[in-house]
Amino acid sequence: MTDRKTLVHSHLHWRNVKRKHWQKDLVAKVVELIKVGDHDALALVARTAGIPPQLRKHVWPVLLKFHPMVVSPNIMSNTLVWDSQHQKWHYHPEIRSEDEIRDQMAHDLGKYFHKRTSAGKRAQSAASGPGAAPGGDLSPLPPGQQRVVAALQQCILKFLQKWAQFFKYESGLAWIALALAEWCPLDGGEDVLPGKRHGAPVNLYHEYFLPEEIRDQLPSESEFAFDELFERLVLVILHSPDIPKAERLARAESEMTSVLQYYPVISGGDLSFQCQLFFKVFSVILPELYQPVSDEETLRPSKKTNWMYWWFKCSGARVFHKQDRARIWDTLLGWRPHPRSLNFYLNYNSKLFDHLYSTRTSSALDSEFFHKICKYGHDAFWFPDLDSLSLGSQDLKCDFQVLSELVRRNKYDNSDDELEITPKNNGTVGSKIKKGVEIPFSLLDPHVQLIFIYMAILQQHEFKLLEFEEAEISEFFNNVPSLSRADDHNYRSLYEEEIESRSVSSSETEPEDLFKRPGSSASTPHMLIEVGDDDKASKSFDDLYNLAGDIWRKWIWRELEDNAGT
């Protein structure tokens, strides 16, 4: 028995050593891509392998600068509400005074820094949603944290002043700003917020060490100021297609049938559609777990169900661990559809900006590295023939047309007369010289991808969740346990030889903390309930991401089979 246990630990050790070698290679490659300015390759790395924590403050600004949803934005509005029955908009402007909004902001931001002193207070605070009123017994913050709150307030107010016609303040903006400040310094320096430990700002490179010789190769200044970065991030997180326009197009294209064929599982829908799709997929993929979660009491509008607000509208802000949320945001910020298909996903767009994107990487990303991050040479959310369709073309304007074509192509008696297929080897947009490798572009809207990532998280924890009571399930959704603990520990100790050789004279470094695993007694636990530390729950996020792709294919194949005869 002892020999077997030793063998298992030895296997895990060498697997982890191999993983750390790969992560060092990833750091080196990302630094090289930053130096040559290959934003297309950086986006590919972000959505497939994730950006190393040490480098997000350099990469996220580049990804946001060229993100399609930033170049041509359209956000879900909480001031304009579309009435599909009467085909008109209803406007609900902000009625709070600026002082009231500032007070609410200060209250929301202040919660980040206050430690929870009891289970009751913690659960109550975690469940509070965007409409929570200011108040409570929160003690005054230290001066340093007050400065952070004031800076973030100013940043959010700038966004609201610019987008006031479409969006008024809600708590999600505060927690998105806080989450961004966990990776991108407010002042352009190196200090970031610590995450779930509710402490003062920490030096990023003390948390995730990076040798001086590597740091010297990185840009000294950021692409954007923090408030500019925040605005661009919010444009991605709150993105929404033009729903009235999409419905009109679907109605026009489906005039041969009596049923409106609006089902944007590829191009993406609004927040309501995302929630509906989540529960539809949930009922098919995890039917046993779906029952307790979809119980009438669980879904009744209350503080318990505000996890849906944080998961879907805020893309994991507040309820996910710092490391896991950042990895999820890597996939959001790295999202890139094929340049020819931009308008299929951005149905409101009137700009011409496909020239910003290349279909091939620079020579800095070679074939060997490419096959490490894309083992099968395509997007994680692939489906047979989907990447060969010219989405948005004359015959493929709507999702239902794309799905119908996929059904037709995947039938056994498929004929040869197919719609336009775009060749795989089509070079670089605007260039005759081929270089690097061909980029496998994103095929699903990024917020639809999130649904399947969330489903993979639930599948990974299914058996434990089935044992939980309703209150424990609610706690899980409002405080998701760490998903990539092993990866985070590796990045914290990636250059441990260099750390050990450094002088320990600086009291700020506190090197002993660098080797403690996240979630140890040194930090405030994120979950009040124990979900286990087994190997399955501590896998790399890459495994979870690939599982999400598998779930997508399983679900959409069943959907196509069920609707093949309609």
Curated annotation (Swiss-Prot):
Cysteine pairs bridged by disulfides in the record: none
Protein name: Oxidant-induced cell-cycle arrest protein 5
Family statement: Belongs to the OCA5 family.
Domain of life of the organism encoding this protein: Eukaryota
Signal peptide: none
Naturally occurring in which organism (per UniProt): Lachancea thermotolerans (strain ATCC 56472 / CBS 6340 / NRRL Y-8284) (Yeast)
Subcellular location: Cytoplasm
Keyword Cytoplasm: yes
Main location: cytoplasm
Keywords, sorted A to Z: Cytoplasm
GO cellular-component term (any): cytoplasm
UniProt feature, compositional bias: Low complexity: 123-139
Region (Disordered): 120-140, 500-522
Entries under InterPro entries matching the protein: Rab-GAP-TBC_dom (IPR000195), Rab-GAP_TBC_sf (IPR035969)
Gene of this entry: OCA5
Record domain Rab-GAP TBC: where: 50-336
